[in-house]
Amino acid sequence: MASPSRSGVFQAETDARLEAYAESISFDSRLYEHDIRGSIAHANMLREVGLLTEDEFKLIRDTLETIRGELDRGELPMRFELEDIHMHVEQALIDRIGDTGRKLHTARSRNDQVSTDTRMWIRQSLDEIDALLVDLQSAFLSRCENDFDIILPAYTHLQRAQPVLAPHYWLAYIEKLERDRQRIADCRKRVNQCSLGIAAVAGTTLPIDRQHTASALDFEGITANSLDTSSDRDFVVESTFVMSLIASHLSGWAEEWILWSTVEFDFIQIPQAFCTGSSIMPQKVNPDTLELTRGKSARVMGALQTLMLLIKNLPLAYNRDLQEDKPPLFDAFDTTRAMLELAAPIVRGAELKRESIAARIEKGYLDATTLMEWMIARGMPQRTAHHLVGAIVSEAMQQGVTLSDLPLETYQKLSDQIDESVYEVLGTSNAIAAFRSEGSTAPARVREQIKQWTSRLENA
């Protein structure tokens, strides 16, 4: 059976090898719900402008609904010679209602049809990813109260830097995920423009109503230029970029918790339901889910690179190259969705190892910066205080003690501006209590943030 897309200009049969090479039904069949919804809206518009009768519209609509049911149940066979989901649906319609079905494609091309289908699929998928991001934010937030009294080392260059409250870590990831949500919302605005009505490349001479179709499909507006619309895949690339950044954030979190779960760090216990063992080493409990999250992020970023290379150097307007946008698009969203679905239960089920963390929290001179700022607050220039505290830390290292255990006489030997009140800011607990600034790990600031995020996520 020849595809409905082949006109009378063709005098030769399609080579079977081309049918297999050019098909996209193996991956674009997942667009069928959007394709049928778009076709019903298009047919309704054709009825409104007088290009279909009321009876013709109802017959097309009802038959498309029947075809949708068959696709839901997997009853409609897929054939390479019909190329894509659009032709499968149209041919099924024609097989059932004949010439009336042939009227559906009036004032429409597969160029604007696939663009619209893809926009609707991305729009729905963005909303689903957004909901998963909220769930992951809620998972991090749910840890904050129980972990509030735990002090962790913050790292720069993977070296211990300053002490922070554990909830400060969780809030940091909530902020990253919120930026991801903001990017989704911003991207969605550009996705949510209806392509239907630009036809192949130049528009149509027929009296269609593009706004009517856009409204029926819940688009915010219509695209402005037929040439641009026919060629545009910015919305595919941009949405995949958003997925790539989400994947990057998840990869960073996974890497951190992989490190934290090692004997060397011994900060966290990953739920065993999300770990696997070794085929030879019986003692192993490996954080495979987190490792796969770190690894799968590369697939999402690779999809973005594929799309960027796909669209470069394409002249206006539509080119068949653009058919290849869907495998990387679908894979990027599918992979990101899978990563998020597993991230939330891991975050909720993990346990910080309080005793192990507390046993080593005073190592690494995490209170050195607080000591420097104590000196600055007493009038010492920052660079002078910075140099002096470095010398104090060096002395403590030589003696093998913490800053809070260093004798006052040693401090005063290095600076006569230091008195016994210095011990009020030494030690990680005192250092935490000394913080004041907005956005810091100060307990009051952290509680403010927890309260704000509790309210925000309740309304998300």
Swiss-Prot record:
What is catalyzed by this enzyme? 2-(N(omega)-L-arginino)succinate = fumarate + L-arginine
Matching entries from HAMAP family are given as: Arg_succ_lyase (MF_00006)
- Top-level class of the enzyme under EC nomenclature: lyase
What keywords is this UniProt entry annotated with? Amino-acid biosynthesis, Arginine biosynthesis, Cytoplasm, Lyase
Question: Can you quote a single GO CC term?
Answer: cytosol
Gene Ontology molecular function: any one: argininosuccinate lyase activity
Q: Family assignment? A: Belongs to the lyase 1 family. Argininosuccinate lyase subfamily.
Q: Tell me the Pfam families matching this sequence.
A: ASL_C2, Lyase_1
Q: In which pathway does it act?
A: Amino-acid biosynthesis; L-arginine biosynthesis; L-arginine from L-ornithine and carbamoyl phosphate: step 3/3
Q: Where in the cell is it found?
A: Cytoplasm
Q: Give the EC number(s) listed in the UniProt record.
A: 4.3.2.1
Organism whose genome encodes this protein: Rhodopirellula baltica (strain DSM 10527 / NCIMB 13988 / SH1)
**Can you cite a GO biological process for this protein?**
L-arginine biosynthetic process
- The answer on whether this UniProt entry bears the keyword Hydrolase reads no
Q: Which PANTHER family match?
A: ARGININOSUCCINATE LYASE
Q: In its keyword annotation, does this UniProt entry include Transcription?
A: no
On the tree of life, the source organism's domain of life is: Bacteria
Query: Where does this chain mainly localize?
Result: cytoplasm
Query: What name goes with this protein?
Result: Argininosuccinate lyase
